[in-house]
Amino acid sequence: MAEYLERILKARVYDVAIETPLDPAPRLSARLGNRILLKREDLQPVFSFKLRGAYNKLAQLTAAERSAGVICSSAGNHGQGVALAGKTMGVRAVIVMPTTTPTIKSEAVRALGGEVVLHGMTYD
């Protein structure tokens, strides 16, 4: 447990992510007979928790690795997280997305500074 806590404390995510609230879910709590709280990661700049992992990974790369850029495969939120993390850190981010990706998703990646490559129909 101590190792896990140490990893959390060392994670560098708050340069780009925000601390999101835990909101009570009274109806769900009543239905389940327990206090239920919802972590509001939809309030992040890319509307997802995936920004945290993407930024933390880029922050742990060496200068040489960052200068080479990063590439990922995503049809949405992870790609947006990588794009924003790359933009924030000055790292080239190439996001490979299926050709079937909705335009709104690929445009969101581009708007965050990611280079979109549309390739293939699926991930299979």
What are the residue ranges of the model-derived segments?
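PLP-dependent amino-acid enzyme catalytic core
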Residues: 1-124
